[in-house]
């Protein structure tokens, strides 16, 4: 069943301000099909996007392709044999889970792997000399789910900038998010409290999940993010017809991590939230991100640990993904409309193999002037290695 539903327009003006509802910029969006793009383009933002009643640009539920696990040594294994299970015998109330416990021994994943694990999955599934597009189910674009979420949520989270590198190889567009200078500076200036709060979510996962053969969670071992369970999906995103009326849709092949499985083998996401999930929660971009992350990989339920300001989970509650938009002030269709515009610009820019570009949202310039795309030499990017490409015809 689809996760799309609820109020098609939302109630965005109450939370995000009337200044977002200025006259539409759609008349300024160029019809660029068949015309060479300049080396640099400022991508206009259409304010009327918030009011859209159009059908969702993702027309249907995503198609499940595969699943895989990554072990502590960062080796990919096909299947779900290492996926964590949700500890459903944990009482939902009167809990006292200290999310700060073990912070000093935290064992995080190091470095930026870019899209290497996604390429490794493709590599393991592909025969030598085969056709790349066949392995990715004839998709046009390969990326992480997180990149899709980041772009979609921009319209309700304008303070967070992003940069995406894009390259076309073997007829496929590969997308990879790069850290902006803003993000790098934010990391450098993290306080001890910032670091501890970013740890809390990982500790929560340890408290409420267990290995397949265990009866109780192991909460004494160091928390690590080096082990993962992830899924692979494909979906079709309608193009922005103002930009490319000749191509109806863009096939997107993407992967994302999933936190755990329930007793029936269904996927679950785990989140923490300060206080209660009251009306205010549904006004903010956090609820939009939660919904995006889950709906893109067909997760039906989100388990939420309700915590204190000091980082102690007192109770658990469950959200049904498909019901979140019904209570929200945001319009999920607007996020998909924005994604469609960005992806259509990329599609139009990368016409032939070896074409490359950077798309960047500079939040300090504002959403009306800060979305820019520029062509770059192909040798600026190394996130799709030649050794990977050489396997395919």
UniProtKB/Swiss-Prot annotation:
UniProt EC number: 3.6.1.-
Family according to the record: Belongs to the DXO/Dom3Z family.
GO biological process, alphabetically ordered: NAD-cap decapping; nuclear-transcribed mRNA catabolic process
Gene name for this UniProt entry: dom-3
Cofactor note: Binds 2 magnesium ions.
Lineage: Eukaryota, Metazoa, Ecdysozoa, Nematoda, Chromadorea
Protein name per the record: Decapping nuclease dom-3
Region of interest: Disordered: 1-37
Catalytic activity as recorded in UniProt: a 5'-end NAD(+)-phospho-ribonucleoside in mRNA + H2O = a 5'-end phospho-ribonucleoside in mRNA + NAD(+) + H(+); a 5'-end (N(7)-methyl 5'-triphosphoguanosine)-ribonucleoside-ribonucleotide in mRNA + H2O = a (N(7)-methyl 5'-triphosphoguanosine)-nucleoside + a 5'-end phospho-ribonucleoside in mRNA + H(+); a 5'-end triphospho-ribonucleoside in mRNA + H2O = a 5'-end phospho-ribonucleoside in mRNA + diphosphate + H(+)
Positions bound to Mg(2+) 2: 205, 257, 259
Function: Decapping enzyme for NAD-capped RNAs: specifically hydrolyzes the nicotinamide adenine dinucleotide (NAD) cap from a subset of RNAs by removing the entire NAD moiety from the 5'-end of an NAD-capped RNA. The NAD-cap is present at the 5'-end of some RNAs and snoRNAs. In contrast to the canonical 5'-end N7 methylguanosine (m7G) cap, the NAD cap promotes mRNA decay. Also acts as a non-canonical decapping enzyme that removes the entire cap structure of m7G capped or incompletely capped RNAs and mediates their subsequent degradation.
Molecular function as annotated in GO: metal ion binding; mRNA 5'-diphosphatase activity; nuclease activity; nucleotide binding; RNA binding; RNA NAD+-cap (NAD+-forming) hydrolase activity
Record organism: Caenorhabditis elegans
InterPro entries xrefs: RAI1, RAI1-like_fam
Any Pfam family hit: RAI1
Top EC group: hydrolase
